[in-house]
Amino acid sequence: MEQTWRWYGPNDPVSLDDVRQAGATGVVTALHHIPNGEIWSVEEIEKRKAELKAKGLVWSVVESVPVHEEIKTQTGNYQQHIANYQQSLRNLAQCGIDTVCYNFMPVLDWTRTDLEYALPDGSKALRFDHIAFAAFELHILQRNGAEKDYTADEQAQAADYYRMMSEDDIARLTGNIIAGLPGSEEGYTLEQFRGRLAEYDGIDHAKLREHLAHFLREIVPVAEAAGLRLAIHPDDPPRSILGLPRVMSTIDDMRWLKQTVDSLHNGFTFCTGSYGVRVDNDLVNMLETFADRVHFTHLRATCREENPNSFHEGAHLQGDVDMVAIINAILAEELRRQKAGDRRPIPMRPDHGHQMLDDLKKKTNPGYSAIGRLKGLAELRGVELALKCTRFTELQQG
């Protein structure tokens, strides 16, 4: 596996020197300063590459080239946004970058309710509390029809939760959900958020799939011609929220994507933490079934709670993900590719570390503090080395 590290650009509290000291050789980054829908120019791409090269690092994966909301809703200037996306892909390929992660989640990117969930050892994790989210939907956002998504017991719990909230609690929960987490290119006020949700009135799961299919038919041929690997990221959490459809949450969704545009350039970012939230997702089977289409991996573990729709981020080798089995499957695919003549390792990054040690005293990007990810990368590296020394000696020699 290629050991990579997500970096949010010059304003990231974690420096490129820190990244190099962590032992990563590749960087996963994006041009966050370019507005959604605009073309990434060769000049801007080369500028970022030069920043990385000066520190002895390479730009391994783009995460992400954001998909404009008008593409998802097929409104406004969506065809122009697609044309701009195509040109950005060509420009990235011209600059030697061959793997692009993206997602097709409506309105919100990844979603959490608590960014400072205290763990027993004193470190902090990210958490999605289903009842807190229900309190937001039912009593703060007051979304029409939201009660249909919750049982009577959950509605009662949400009402109790809301009654106990202070004004600061309400502001914090609202901000955590709609203000934009790291990697999200857009944040909203409450009124803007209601307006965004309204844009999806009449767009159900089938319709959003149609829109994704149209997008894929437009961009996959460009990726094929340019030698780019596209890697769609799963929904996080992997189910419908806020009445919005989600189209990349299960093995059936993965199968649909492959069948819709059957090309090796139309592939997946296999995020174990996102897919792993669902108890019905067999991660190893999903990975092995679509191994030849997995172009990028996010390795992290989540811990489902008493309410199975609630979860928090676990340590990388703990929680509900069998990380040893996952890495074993990744290495098996790497060996298969190597025997077929493709010696490129599959890029992997340690996803979402705990905030711990000295980072507890610092301002950090939620989920992306340095020390927690350093710990995760070291643990994942150890599993990889152990498997290479015992089961995949051909890769060790390679």
Curated annotation (Swiss-Prot):
Name the Enzyme Commission number(s) assigned to this protein.
Answer: 4.2.1.8
GO annotation, biological process: D-glucuronate catabolic process
Catalyzes what? D-mannonate = 2-dehydro-3-deoxy-D-gluconate + H2O
InterPro entries of this UniProt entry?
Man_deHydtase, Xyl_isomerase-like_sf
HAMAP family per UniProt: UxuA (MF_00106)
Q: What is this protein called?
A: Mannonate dehydratase
Q: Which domain of life is it from?
A: Bacteria
Similarity field: Belongs to the mannonate dehydratase family.
Keywords recorded for this protein, A-Z: Iron, Lyase, Manganese
Has UniProt tagged this entry with the keyword Transmembrane helix? no
Enzyme class label: lyase
- Pathway note: Carbohydrate metabolism; pentose and glucuronate interconversion
Q: Which cofactor does it need?
A: Fe(2+); Mn(2+)
What is the role of the protein in this entry? Catalyzes the dehydration of D-mannonate.
Name a GO molecular-function annotation: mannonate dehydratase activity
Its organism's taxonomic lineage begins at: Bacteria, Pseudomonadati, Pseudomonadota, Gammaproteobacteria, Enterobacterales
